Amino acid sequence: MPVISVFGIPVDFILFALTLLGVALFHHHTLRVALTGLAAIVAYKLAFTAFPTGPGIAGLAAHMQHEAVILSNLFLLLMGFALLSRHFEESKLPDIVPAYLPDDWKGGFALLVIVFVLSSFLDNIAAALIGGVMAREVFKGKVHIGYLAAIVAASNAGGSGSVVGDTTTTMMWIAGVSPLVVVEAYVAAAVALVICGIPAAMQQHKYSPIMKDAPAGIKVDWTRVAIVFGILIIAILSNVIANVSFPWILDKLPIIGLAVWAVLLATAALRRPDWSVMPETFKGTIFLLALVTCASLMPVERLPVASWQTALGLGFVSAVFDNIPLTALALKQGGYDWGFLAFAVGFGGSMIWFGSSAGVALATMYPEARSVGLWLRHGWHIAVAYVIGFFVMLAVIGWRPDAPL
């Protein structure tokens, strides 16, 4: 694929960097900026270079066909989990959570631990949204941006050591990486949770303390609770069964997304989903898909030589670059310690709000989180936690690379 460079930097990357800069500067117009950037990159490739699958319209069509399952699965999950989070909120179950959490900053930290655990077996989007709903209730609607960033970090950390907790770890599993290798990421993830979770919980306690007791007279809608758990169980089962018994179908159909929507529609007669959240969720979803598509169009055909330094750097890259193609390239190249890579590309995306699908989903629920400046300023502890967690894992386990797969 021909590449045109300016001072050694491919023009594709310059256009992508300008798009990300626009998202950071104009956080009230993120969708427009992302779509404009995507249009510019596509136009440039049509006119001057080529797509990863070839030149011209045919190359674009082939590329979009190649990305169709990933994009459609993200679309279905983001839209579906938004409805799930509303079912969860309207069930009133989050309203009784304060009765079971400590009354000071430790209550906020305990909530982050819950999100971490949920994400170990749920999709991190669902875990982040459930955490966002609970935070809204227990903090009386006032949630600090630093704490929102920590919710995203907790959801990404919890999924980093589980082959069913994150798309990237599932990719490793499909490629033949043992789940026992991936689970080592929890050494770094647990440390990172503590390092970022405690400061975030203290930020939140100072901003708006946790409710000391649950409001009186709360009546939980157990039918909605059952719907929520039904969706989550079916999503988990569809993921595991497809990966174990029918891995070929994962390249053909967005299995998990379809499973989520099948349960949502099947249970609509019992409790009507809150369709009113769809317009705003749709905007956030298209924004993420635009950035993911931009990233997939970049001329990244290889990574630096596999090493712990490269893995550490990929964590920072994943904050602005979709971690799915990064993981695919790493698997193709081989020579990584997959536990380190799982933590790096999983947790690293938490450093900026649009660095992970969980962050974009939560920012749809909390629009104030769409400011990169505020996210970096108040979520400073995430980058610190990433570096400390990585080096603790390096000291405890050591870099043990596998042979190419």
Language-model features, listed with the residues they occupy:
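Juxtamembrane and boundary regions of transmembrane helices in multi-pass small-molecule transporters
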Residues: 84, 90-93, 141-145, 149, ...
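Interfacial loop-to-helix junctions that mark the boundaries of transmembrane helices
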Residues: 2-8, 25-30, 56-74, 178-188, ...
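Short helix-coil transition sites and intra-membrane helix breaks within transmembrane domains
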Residues: 27-30, 84-92, 118-130, 158-166, ...
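Transmembrane helical segments that form the transport core of multi-pass membrane transport proteins
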Residues: 231-336
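Cytoplasmic-side transmembrane-helix entry/capping segments in multi-pass membrane proteins
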Residues: 31-40, 98-110, 143-153, 276-289, ...
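Hydrophobic transmembrane alpha-helices that form the pore/transport pathway of multi-pass ion
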Residues: 106-160, 171-175, 328-343, 368-371, ...
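Membrane-interfacial loop-to-helix junctions in multi-pass transporters
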Residues: 8-13, 70-74, 100-113, 139-149, ...
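Hydrophobic mid-bilayer segments of alpha-helices in multi-pass membrane transport proteins
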Residues: 10-20, 27-55, 71-83, 224-234, ...
